[in-house]
């Protein structure tokens, strides 16, 4: 039931801030949808994004100076509602991993890796896909294997026994210090 607690707490300005525990609790259906999303490695279609072009910077000579090869891809969250579960969209809106790419109502990615517009469009769409998949993976915490649970219980038991033996040792030491007056 408790899928992930690390997203519930954020360290900010040296203090722990509680951040709505309901965001971290995923139902079985949501967990299945999440795993399906991660497994499929979802990639936005060109009709789901808004693409614009501008002049690229850096080396490239006349190609850089005259052609608009830099690609700016905006992915509005409204476009995601038809193909991605709502709890994931809400996660994308608040996820720390996407904070540098988030704009008011979507995600904005730049690409000027190559000298071709088409390759830069593909690169930008791949960047969006990778970012959203990595962000979704932070929500999933697999079940603890039984071997690890058994090991943890053994360690707890040993720790408790050690604590009790130290306590008995201190008690015995104090009783030996007492002087009995007969």
From Swiss-Prot:
Mitochondrion recorded as keyword: yes
Alphabetical keyword list: Meiosis, Mitochondrion
Cited PROSITE patterns: RF_PROK_I (PS00745)
Biased composition (Basic residues): 169-182
Main location: mitochondrion
Region annotated Disordered, chain positions: 161-182
Listed GO MF terms: peptidyl-tRNA hydrolase activity; translation release factor activity; translation release factor activity, codon nonspecific
Biological processes, Gene Ontology terms: meiotic cell cycle; mitochondrial translational termination
InterPro entries, sorted: Mito_Release_Factor_mL62, Pep_chain_release_fac_I, Pep_chain_release_fac_I_sf
One of the record's GO cellular component terms: mitochondrial inner membrane
Cell compartments where the protein resides: Mitochondrion
Family: Belongs to the prokaryotic/mitochondrial release factor family.
Summary of the function given for this chain in its UniProt record: Has a role in meiosis.
Protein name (Swiss-Prot/TrEMBL): Meiotically up-regulated gene 82 protein
């Amino acid at each position: 039931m408790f899928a992930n607690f690390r997203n519930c707490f954020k360290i900010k300005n040296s203090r722990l801030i509680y951040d709505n525990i309901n965001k971290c609790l995923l139902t079985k259906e949501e967990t299945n949808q999440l795993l399906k999303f991660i497994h499929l490695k979802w990639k936005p279609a060109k009709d789901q994004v808004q693409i614009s072009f501008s002049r690229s910077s850096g080396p490239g000579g006349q190609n850089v100076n005259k052609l608009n090869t830099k690609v700016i891809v905006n992915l509005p969250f409204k476009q995601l509602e038809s193909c991605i579960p709502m709890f994931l969209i809400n996660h994308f809106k608040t996820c720390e991993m996407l904070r540098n790419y988030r704009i008011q109502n979507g995600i904005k990615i730049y690409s000027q890796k190559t000298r071709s517009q088409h390759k830069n469009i593909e690169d930008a769409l791949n960047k969006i896909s990778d970012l959203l998949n990595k962000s979704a993976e932070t929500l999933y915490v697999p079940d603890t294997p039984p071997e690890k649970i058994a090991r943890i219980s053994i360690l707890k038991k040993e720790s408790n026994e050690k604590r009790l033996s130290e306590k008995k040792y201190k008690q015995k030491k104090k009783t030996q210090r007492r002087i009995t007056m007969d």
